[in-house]
């Protein structure tokens, strides 16, 4: 199972997270937090949220340092 990035339309932090992941060559699927009631309940105030196998790896402001630590880049 790969990475899943929970995002929201118009979210600048989500756009930054997506760009950072792409720059590091990390492929992920995207899910809109507002399109799923369960995701909305869990993550509405936490986006962007990076998941792997259902586990939260990062949320909020993504930085290269935080990403590197979590993914051992």
Q: Which functions belong to the PLM regions below?
A:
Residues 43:
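Surface-exposed interaction regions that form or flank ligand-binding interfaces
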Residues 6, 31, 59:
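Small/polar loops that bind or transfer phosphate-bearing groups
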């Amino acid at each position: 199972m790969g990475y899943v990035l929970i995002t929201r339309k118009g979210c600048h932090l989500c756009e930054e997270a997506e760009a950072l992941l792409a720059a590091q060559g990390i492929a992920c699927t995207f899910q809109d937090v507002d399109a799923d009631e369960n995701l909305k309940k869990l993550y509405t105030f936490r986006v962007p949220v990076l998941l792997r196998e259902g586990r939260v790896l990062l949320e909020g402001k993504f930085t290269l340092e935080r990403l590197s630590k979590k993914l051992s880049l």
